[in-house]
A protein has these predicted regions:
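Structure-specific DNA junction-binding interface
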Residues: 1-105
Length: 105
């Protein structure tokens, strides 16, 4: 896989065959090339990768169904990835709080 475009789903086997750093680099290159201003390109790319990883795994039906629903409701695939990533970011933030438990909701 030589390029990433969030408008097109990566082929799962090709995506998962990449090293995590390669995935982050591909996503970062897309955003730099598209001249999308971001406060933290690395964090943004990492959340894109986390969502794409879930979409590529066969057992992550809920994530795939959610992404498809968001697209049916009118979001672009890129914006739908952002929507899923925003939920993930909130959960990560919650888990980083003192006393948080990974088993909470």
């Amino acid at each position: 896989m030589e390029r990433y475009d969030p408008a097109d789903a990566p082929i799962p086997d090709e995506w998962l065959a990449l090293d995590e750093g390669e995935r982050i680099d591909l996503v970062g290159r897309f955003h730099r090339g598209a001249r999308i201003p971001l406060p933290n390109l690395l964090a943004h790319a990492a959340f894109h990768v986390a969502v794409e990883n879930q979409l590529a795994l066969p057992d992550q039906v809920l994530v795939r169904d959610t992404l498809q629903r968001l697209i049916r409701e009118g979001l672009s695939r890129h914006d739908a990835i952002h929507a899923v990533a925003s939920v993930l970011a909130v959960r990560v933030h919650e888990l980083l709080q003192p006393g948080a438990s990974a088993t909470e909701s």
